[in-house]
Amino acid sequence: MTTTQALTVRQNATAATALLVGPALMAGYGVVRLVGRAVSDYGPGVWWTLAHLLFLAGVLAFVPVFLGLRGLAGERGGGRTAATVAAWTGLLGAAAVVVQAVIDLTAGFAAADKQAMSEMFDRVQGVPGVMPLVYTVVPMLFWLGLLALVTLLAFLRRDVVRPWAPVLVLAGTVLMAVNLDLLPVGALCLGAALLPVRRGLPG
């Protein structure tokens, strides 16, 4: 086995694990968030920190997911090019979401109470460019890239990506966008869409 082949096998193994772990961590974030809100202690403190650590880990887990899905498109041709564009679009969005999670964690550690944390967020979000780059526009590329990639593979790799997978990804994205309380359900939709892909990763 060549070095390149060994790296590909390792990348696919990582992607296969991440296809399970990524949605699970996001679901965990949603559950912890709900628990924290239920006990009226969702601000600076344990629940906030735990939830956002799970969120950060979940987003990072999608990095190998994007790379693994891109690899399923083949080595060359228009499909590979389109998959590469979709993957890098998703990764750009993931980078913005990671920054958002780090800001949330930092505010949680630094603030003494919810009021102080809110004031910190106001200062950060008041910096020109921060809102579109970190909170509103660029983070959406994560979901758009994932949806585009899964949709593309549903046509290119019907043996691996089920035809209903893009519908589940879209449903999960919409649920999480409409109401953060639906994060666990949305994450389960993502997991159901991505789980069958694991067997298509060569390794």
Residue ranges and their predicted role:
Residues T2-G203:
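Hydrophobic, aromatic-enriched alpha-helical segments typical of multi-pass transmembrane helices
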